[in-house]
Amino acid sequence: MNPTTQKLVEQNAPAQLVDHNLVPETVCPGVLYEKRPARNLKGEVVPGLYNVWISLDNPKQYNSYTTDMVKGLILAFRAASCARDVASVVFTAVGDKAFCTGGNTKEYAEYYAGNPQEYRQYMRLFNDMVSAILGCDKPVICRVNGMRIGGGQEIGMAADFTVAQDLANFGQAGPKHGSAAIGGATDFLPLMIGCEQAMVSGTLCEPFSAHKANRLGICMQIVPALKVDGKFIANPLVVTDRYLDEFGRIIHGEFKTGDELAAGKELMKRGEIDLSLLDEAVEKLCAKLISTFPECLTKSFEELRKPKLDAWNRNKENSRAWLALNMMNEARTGFRAFNEGNKETGREIEFTDLRQALAKGMPWTPELIESLMPGAK
């Protein structure tokens, strides 16, 4: 700050600032809140200005969010929103395996399954979390350090920007595990990648690569994260060296198969994961954002968020009601199957068995649910 501006601040700034946070600053297990010095485009620290890093910290469960973590995220985004010295928010997670895989399946299966009135209250918190991200007074950058799946994809899409390491996978999981992606995905995906690709992602539940996410427009930038013999290389499990196959179909960003996949896996074993380029890209984006008029930037991202907000606000309450009632049958079954299954039995029910039973008019009963669990005979 130059001397003239500094003198004006000393003469005119309030001696005591009002605290606009809802509650005093707290630390929630599973959510990290860290203020890091902001840097300009030259890489120099800007005294008195910061970027907040809000990180999910549950790596043993792929950074899935518990109920307490959801509450912590709401408060964290509120605190960052109110912080006068904060320029941007970086939303990320601990480790290099997962940004977030959605709600905590153990909690879903063992507490919320069969408890629609409880899950309805949980969904109030979930909705408030998504709204806190969409309503943050600072630009929000999703730093994708690993897989962004299910509810993790939904909260990630609520951010303004996505920067990802290229080993990360993206996608939805709802219909495979007893739910529907109506916690934001069905609102955001058609806007971001088009109706057809949104239908593919939201119903088939097939993950796609960071390279494909970048091509589809759900991710603004990707960076390599795998080092082999000290050199960064592109994700060896994904086609990155050509755009079309012999029939003119786009294959860039698609997963490799056959011998190519086997060779890619061998290359993966030789490498090590290094997220330094991801951090560099995120810091550079933060520096670009700080090099703008603050209110003009705020107005710009508030306006550009409107398509997401319009869809989200139109649907979130009836989505909450349906998800609560769904805990009585399909969600109760799917989340239990995932929680109780293992590598040997699998973590999904036999879907055709359920469909055949329902086709015969079988009502939902506890016995039916038990018969569908992985390993049941």
Swiss-Prot record:
Q: What are the recorded GO MF terms, alphabetically?
A: 1,4-dihydroxy-2-naphthoyl-CoA synthase activity; 6-hydroxycyclohex-1-ene-1-carboxyl-CoA hydratase activity; hydrolase activity, acting on acid carbon-carbon bonds, in ketonic substances
Q: Is Hydrolase tagged as a keyword?
A: yes
UniProt key word Disulfide bond: no
Its annotated function is as follows: Involved in the central benzoyl-CoA catabolism. Catalyzes the addition of one molecule of water to the double bond and the hydrolytic cleavage of C-C bond in the alicyclic ring, 6-oxocyclohex-1-ene-1-carbonyl-CoA (6-OCH-CoA) to yield 3-hydroxypimelyl-CoA.
Tell me what reaction this enzyme catalyses: 6-oxocyclohex-1-ene-1-carbonyl-CoA + 2 H2O = 3-hydroxy-6-carboxyhexanoyl-CoA + H(+)
The GO cellular component terms are: cytosol
One of the protein's GO biological processes: menaquinone biosynthetic process
User: What do we know about how this protein assembles, alone or with others?
Assistant: Homotetramer.
**Its annotated pathway?**
Aromatic compound metabolism; benzoyl-CoA degradation
* Primary gene name: oah
Kindly report, in one word, the top-level EC class recorded for this enzyme: hydrolase
- Keywords from the UniProt entry: Hydrolase
Q: What taxonomic ancestry is recorded?
A: Bacteria, Pseudomonadati, Pseudomonadota, Betaproteobacteria, Rhodocyclales
Q: What is its EC number?
A: 3.7.1.21
Assigned protein family = Belongs to the enoyl-CoA hydratase/isomerase family.
Q: What is this protein called?
A: 6-oxocyclohex-1-ene-1-carbonyl-CoA hydrolase
Q: Which Pfam families does the record match to this protein? A: ECH_1 (PF00378)
